[in-house]
């Protein structure tokens, strides 16, 4: 939904345009599920959007950069890219920059690292979807103790996610998610 809002804010009509998903590992069920969920939501929001074939890059940022740059150059109507982890996020941010497509191709990545954070600040990467690794670990330990002490634990826990963009990257709550050790 955030990407659609970004397109509208930039005056980009996504109808009939192209979109790309970069998959970090064909062997990872988590990444497969993440990508499938993302693509299904995009198709629900913009049914006429054309999904390019998912690109599998085996968690290689250099390969991701090259694939991103090549596909941007070959598809002038490509308006969005989703990278399903931080290494592919590094690659798409460098590929978008190398293709001179910052601000034209909206790039979102899952997870965050220093290169991606800088790319968001520089306006090359539109945003990142980040979790709360400290909170996830804390809750995991808490539920493990509860289970060992025969207390009831939830069957499922929504650990949440935050969309980080240039507009909120300096927010103290977002800073805590990006730099949990500080």
State the predicted function of each range.
Residues 16, 77-78, 125:
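Local beta-strand N-terminus motif with an aromatic residue
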Residues 15-17, 48, 103-105:
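Short acidic capping loops at alpha-helix termini that bridge into adjacent secondary structure
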Residues 127-129:
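Paired acidic/hydrophobic, glycine-rich loop segments that form the ligand-binding mouth/hinge
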Residues 1-20:
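A conserved helix-loop-strand patch within extracytoplasmic ligand-binding domains
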Residues 15-26, 30, 132-182:
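Hinge/cleft segment of the Venus flytrap/periplasmic-binding protein
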Residues 18-21, 42-58:
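Short beta-strand elements in bilobed, periplasmic/extracellular small-molecule ligand-binding domains
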Residues 2, 29-49, 67, 91, ...:
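Short, solvent-exposed amphipathic alpha-helices that sit
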Residues 37-38, 53-119:
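Hydrophobic alpha-helical
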């Amino acid at each position: 939904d955030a990407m659609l809002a970004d397109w509208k804010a930039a005056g980009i009509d996504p109808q009939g345009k192209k979109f790309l998903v970069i998959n970090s590992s064909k062997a990872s069920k988590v990444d497969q599920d993440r990508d499938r969920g993302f693509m299904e939501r995009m198709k629900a929001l913009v049914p006429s959007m054309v999904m390019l074939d998912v690109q599998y890059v085996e968690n290689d940022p250099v390969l991701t950069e090259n694939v991103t740059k090549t596909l941007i150059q070959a598809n002038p109507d490509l308006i969005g890219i989703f990278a399903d982890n931080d290494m592919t996020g590094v690659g798409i941010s460098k590929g978008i920059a190398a293709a001179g497509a910052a601000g034209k191709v909206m790039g979102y990545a899952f997870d965050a690292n220093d290169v991606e954070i800088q790319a968001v600040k520089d306006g090359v990467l539109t945003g990142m979807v980040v979790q709360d690794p400290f909170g996830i670990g804390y809750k995991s330990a808490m539920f493990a103790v509860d289970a060992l002490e025969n207390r009831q634990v939830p069957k499922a826990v929504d650990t949440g996610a935050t969309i980080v963009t240039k507009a909120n990257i300096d927010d103290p709550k977002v800073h805590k998610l990006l730099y949990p050790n500080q």
